[in-house]
Amino acid sequence: LSGCFAAAAQAILGEGHVHRGLIATGDQFISGAEHKSALYSEFRAMAAEMEGGAIAQVAAMDGVPFAVIRSISDLADGTAADSFDTFEKHAADASAAALRQALRAL
C-alpha cells in the first residue's frame, strides 16, 4: 500500500521529494533541532507527527491496511510558523493530487 502511494507522490512531485521510512508519532509538536535529532538517533525517524499513531493502532487491530501520507510543513528548526503559512496550500494540493493518482492505481 505504501509503495502505491509513494509512486503516485513521486509522479506528482518529481525526483527527490518523496521519502519512505519511519514516522514518529506522539503527543507533542516537535519544533527544535535537538528533539528532532534525538528522535532520529533513537528511532531513525524521518519525520514526526501527532495523528497517525492512533489511527495506525486501530487499523492494525482490525487488520485494515494503512499508510500515513504526510506533507512536511516544517523542518523542526524553530521556523514552524513561517513554514506552515508558506507551504499549507502547496502541501494540500500536492497531497490531494497524489492521493487521487494512487486511488486510481488501486
State where each predicted segment sits.
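Glycine-rich phosphate- or other oxyanion-binding loops that anchor nucleotides, phosphorylated ligands
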Residues: 1-106
